[in-house]
């Protein structure tokens, strides 16, 4: 829409995307680190205010520079929102951190899935000014987040009154070197997951149209099925990690998707869609488990860790889109699909993650151990 209206070059479109990626991904770990040291209960509402102003500017922007300002503000809103939201989700989890993280993330996944649909139904028919209509949703979100900020402020007061011994402490005894190694492995896993998902979300429709002659509308329905399955997988991954252990969910999610991903580019049209749904369902269950596993490694740095991995998610998604687009221009859509399907095989390195017993599975083992000890004493 913006390219057609303003006659932007592909380079200018790329710069707009880059500004959004820079502000929404690179800033997140630093904002999360600041929030860990100086919690701000109303930062969630403040972040949504950035988004609100960005949407309003974007709806009336007359040229390139105002559009850059608008997308930069929207990206900053995302950077402020995600790290603190993860902390609030874990505070409200009642110990079921995986479930809470999944519920939080599925909201974002649902919004991402609805984005193309809303663009087709609202923005394209009614033009640039219709972007301002979404400001109403941002205003509603600010009101809700202000109420959440009130609750968060109360929780911070309660936490501040606890003795120093009650401060967050890791449930493991890993050294700094092993923690850094584990975080590095998680980073590689996020790379494999989101580079692969970038190839699917951006080029799956072209793959279906080029190879099978499926219509544009039909290919969009197939992409929506993949994104819908991804949302379901996101919901399932968190509570499953609470029950059986996050390491096993991460392992099964990324490596478990590999066989279906490898078969996808060789299947027929119906088989390709069915396999895409399976891949979306399986591979999307990993991220909430990855975030909670990482925050269990460093429980006093929830904001920084959440910001780091959400930043990686956005940043790698953008890099993956650009890389596979560059590769597709020089080869073919089918070739990039065959290359990208190798990425889930990196899930095998999950085996090098240390075992951390937290959540329900860890608590259950603790209770069993206590019961056994009690019986032996009797």
What are the language-model segments listed below?
Residues 104-154:
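Helix-loop-helix hairpin linking two adjacent transmembrane segments in secondary transporters
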Residues 241-290:
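C-terminal transmembrane helical hairpin of 12-TM major facilitator-type secondary transporters
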Residues 27-39, 234-245, 328-329:
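Helix-to-loop junctions at the C-terminal end of transmembrane segments
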Residues 21-29, 112-113, 227-235, 317-318:
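Residue-level signature of mid-helix packing/kink "hotspots" within the transmembrane helices
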Residues 42-57, 248-262, 341:
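Structural signature of the two symmetry-related core transmembrane helices
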Residues 26-64:
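Conserved MFS/SLC helix-loop-helix module at the cytosolic interface between two early adjacent transmembrane helices
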Residues 70-107:
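Cytoplasmic helix-loop-helix junction between adjacent transmembrane helices
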């Amino acid at each position: 829409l913006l390219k057609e209206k303003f006659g932007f070059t592909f380079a200018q479109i790329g710069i707009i995307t880059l500004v959004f990626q820079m502000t929404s991904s690179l800033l997140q770990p630093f904002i999360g680190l600041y929030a860990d040291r100086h919690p701000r209960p109303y930062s969630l509402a403040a972040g949504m205010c950035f988004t609100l102003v960005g949407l309003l500017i974007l709806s009336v922007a007359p040229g390139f520079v105002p559009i850059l300002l608008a997308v930069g503000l929207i990206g900053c809103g995302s950077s402020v929102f995600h790290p603190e939201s993860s902390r609030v989700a874990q505070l409200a989890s009642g110990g079921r951190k995986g479930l809470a993280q999944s519920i939080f993330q599925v909201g974002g996944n649902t919004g991402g899935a609805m984005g193309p649909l809303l663009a087709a139904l609202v923005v394209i028919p009614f033009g640039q000014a219709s972007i301002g209509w979404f400001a109403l949703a941002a205003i509603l979100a600010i009101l809700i987040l202000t109420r959440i900020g009130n609750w968060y402020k109360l929780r911070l007061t309660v936490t501040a009154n606890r003795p120093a011994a009650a401060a967050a402490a890791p449930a493991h005894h890993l050294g700094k070197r092993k923690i850094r190694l584990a975080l590095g492995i998680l980073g590689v896993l996020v790379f494999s997951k989101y580079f692969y998902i970038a190839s699917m979300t951006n080029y799956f429709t072209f793959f279906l149209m080029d190879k099978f002659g499926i219509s544009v509308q039909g290919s969009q329905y197939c992409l929506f099925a993949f994104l819908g399955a991804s949302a379901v997988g996101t919901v399932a991954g968190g509570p499953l990690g609470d029950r059986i252990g996050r390491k096993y969910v991460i392992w099964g999610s990324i490596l478990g998707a590999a066989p279906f991903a490898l078969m996808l580019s060789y299947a027929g049209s119906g088989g390709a869609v069915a396999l895409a749904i399976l891949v979306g369902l399986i591979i999307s269950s990993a991220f909430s488990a990855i975030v909670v596993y990482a925050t269990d490694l460093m429980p006093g740095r929830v904001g920084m860790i959440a910001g780091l991995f959400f930043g990686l998610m956005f940043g790698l998604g953008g890099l993956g889109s650009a890389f596979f687009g560059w590769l597709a221009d020089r080869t073919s859509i089918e070739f990039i699909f065959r290359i990208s399907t190798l990425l889930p095989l990196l899930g095998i390195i999950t085996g090098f993650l240390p075992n951390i017993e937290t959540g329900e599975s860890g608590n259950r083992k603790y209770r069993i151990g206590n019961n056994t000890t009690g019986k032996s004493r009797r």
